[in-house]
């Protein structure tokens, strides 16, 4: 029986490769979002009263891949945690009291998340490599 999406036969090997390929794409999206967070970790508003960059977080959703459960990036949501506040009355975005809102990005957390995403990506690459090396039935 062929897969309705790609036309290949539905086999455990192809299913494993499909699940892992979807996970690779999801982790790639996750790493892109983390990189954007790190790149904007110091991006403040340019005018008083404006908001700085708000950390983005990926939301994943389960999906069916030939009877197995895979994953897909469902959406990217802004992190609603509060902004950091710093006293800097000379900054163009400082409020009347001299405080500037800073992004709610913690670069240490982002670095840990990046490493976790890299390891998940590598694990899924290994699944694909192992599935490719399996003998077809």
At which residue positions do the language-model features occur?
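Amphipathic alpha-helical polymerization modules
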Residues: 1-137
């Amino acid at each position: 029986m062929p897969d309705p999406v790609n036309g290949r036969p539905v086999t455990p090997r192809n299913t494993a490769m499909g699940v892992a390929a979807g996970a690779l794409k999801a982790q790639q999206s996750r790493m892109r979002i983390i990189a954007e967070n790190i790149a904007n970790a110091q991006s403040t508003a340019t005018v008083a009263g404006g908001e700085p960059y708000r950390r983005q977080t990926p939301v994943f959703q389960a999906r069916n891949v030939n009877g197995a459960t895979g994953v897909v990036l469902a959406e990217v949501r802004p992190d609603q945690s509060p902004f950091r506040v710093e006293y800097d009355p000379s900054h163009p975005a400082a409020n009347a009291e001299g405080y500037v809102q800073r992004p709610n990005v913690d670069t240490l957390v982002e670095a840990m998340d990046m490493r976790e995403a890299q390891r998940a990506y590598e694990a899924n690459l290994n699944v694909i490599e192992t599935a490719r090396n399996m003998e077809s039935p």
